[in-house]
Regions:
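A charge-rich, low-complexity, intrinsically flexible signal that marks solvent-exposed coils, linkers
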Residues: 2, 73-75
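Short, charge-rich amphipathic interface segments used for partner binding and complex assembly
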Residues: 36-66
């Protein structure tokens, strides 16, 4: 397991979540907003899949939850 790769993926999940949150509350409307947010969520899914191959399913779920919690805290500030 590459600790730096796991950290990179968690950081990417945080960034994608924050981008989706901003897209939800931003000025875009309609289909463009939906497509933007969908793309961010799909990217999070890809990161989660990569985490599963690195650390296994249970640890990947924990890492995803930690990243989303951290991103939620940052987005709220």
């Amino acid at each position: 397991m590459s600790t730096s790769e796991v950290a990179r993926l968690k950081q990417q999940i945080e960034l994608e979540y924050i981008a989706a949150e901003r897209g939800l509350n931003g000025f875009a409307a309609g289909a463009a907003k939906h497509e933007f947010i969908t793309a961010r969520m799909e990217n999070i899914g890809r990161c989660h899949e990569q985490l599963k191959t690195l650390v296994g399913e249970n640890e990947a779920i924990k890492a995803l939850a930690q990243a989303l919690e951290q991103a939620g805290s940052e987005a709220a500030q």
